[in-house]
Amino acid sequence: MRWHGRLHGLTVAIMFVILFTGEELKAQDINSVQRNKLMLPELIQGVLARNPELVAARKQWEAATNRITQARSLDDPILSIQLWNVPQPFKATQADNTIFGLSQNLPFPGKLGLKGEVASRSADMTEQAVHAKERELVTRLKQAYYDLFLMQKTIQIHHEQVELLRQFFEIANTKFRAGKGSQADVLKAQVELSLLQQQLPVLEQRRKTAGAMLNTLLDRDPSLPLGLAQEPSPLPIDQPLDDLHRLALNDRPELKAAELDVQRNEQSHALAQRQYYPDFNVAFQRFQNYQANDGFGAYVAMSIPFAFWTKPKYDAGVQEAAAGVAVARAQQQTLENLTRFQINDLLAKLRATDQVATLYRTTILPQAEQSLESARVGYRAGKGGFLDLIDTQRAWKGFQLEYFKALVDRQHRLAELEQVVGIPLDRQS
């Protein structure tokens, strides 16, 4: 009997250490909750201002814009000096003829304009790539934000479960001391608490990983502490499917870029056809004669692209450009079809997760909470077993986690849908 009492005292001491550790961790978590709130709109502004991927995309746009002037410009003029019949030994001033020339290559009218249009369409495509990168980064930021929320909420639920098991332990210990319960119930509570304590380091690591991803998108130190991510308030998506299709087809940057690619290839095709026309070279010359009168001269030269031995080259260029137009149009149609599919698919997934989250929030969680309270009252009154109480507690915890996972999955799908459609569908954004 004395050994039995010592064993019970040792068990209580161990439980005290575990509970003290749990309470200390819980206090740390409460302190983290009291930090500044992490607001999604402010983070979106930050990622659009600082993310290096976006900085690089904007610089690529700037570079592409500067290619337009280059494409529209003439080649450099050529300054030449010719010496004819220079006496020996070499004396340049006594050459019979010294010719100073200035020449300029002139493409056939319209060629430079078409080259500029091709470069302009390429620059416009790069601009749309910037807008697409902005949407992509906002989507990734939202998903990282809600991943962080899920891990913070998981840790909060973990500490709530520790507190709940502490209460179960106190009930079991009180019943055991009064001779109305079994020491096995006390030991079961100890085991459950130990299992929870083992889970905490893994949860903390996952929270740090989620925070590091968010900081990386914001171009900050991955280990920088973050505030508390806010729980989303899911609102129904009221826009009809046809309206979402119309918005995406009109505003999606990738589709605008595809249309610009068609235009660019059409301009390239027109330029290839213009290669059948000759280019020119004009020159102005000044003649200085050693023992004769000085004078001026000029000439005009013309290329012959329609010679039978060069024309096949230009024929192939036109055929290549025509194939490029066909490819661009096919890719545009493919992207339009993909956009419609993505909207249908994401909207269906979004509504499915909405239904799941609503079912948990309105039915499963209230029922599980009632079941837990009933099991606790029944065990305290001696009408239920401790194992039933533990099973009910596990179910309650699992249902909470599944609810928040469904909620976060819903926000992931919403972010992806907003990326495709091109407008915010969530007021919190």
Name each model-derived stretch:
Residues A56-A71, K133, L137-I157, R166-F169, ...:
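Amphipathic alpha-helical coiled-coil segments
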Residues R2-W3, G9, A132-L249, L346-K349, ...:
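Periplasmic alpha-helical coiled-coil/stalk elements that build and connect Gram-negative outer-membrane
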Residues L25-W84, N105-L106, L114, S120, ...:
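Bacterial Sec-pathway N-terminal export signals of envelope proteins
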Residues R2-R6, K26-S32, E402-S429:
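Acidic, low-complexity, intrinsically disordered peripheral segments
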Residues Q94-T98, D294-A298:
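Residues that define the transmembrane beta-barrel architecture of outer-membrane proteins
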Residues Q45-V55, E62-P77, P89-A92, F100-E117, ...:
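A glycine-/polar-enriched beta->alpha junction
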Residues E117-S120, Q183-V191, F386-Q393:
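Short, charged, amphipathic alpha-helical segments
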